[in-house]
């Protein structure tokens, strides 16, 4: 079964940047995109994801709230919260809900490091 990654950001350009970085590292992984938390949760209820890459600042529920809800659905799933807001409080709150904080603009190096840590946690082949 294909490794499924949920990418959530209200900005199409940001989703494209995240997808590009992910594809460069893991071209065989299936990417599914959503524009907001409600859409993401609807997709998550249709079938499980192996990883989630979430924007922090979105209309409606933010990435922190979405990360917490996704962790309830799939405990232990690697989740990254991606934001240009580098406040310590945001980073700490991300960790509190079981997410890893990645700064925007997202670099391929940061994505690679996150995937490596996720591979180690999940025992994913190719990690």
Q: Residues of each region from the PLM?
A:
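Acidic catalytic/metal-coordinating carboxylates
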Residues: 36, 62-65
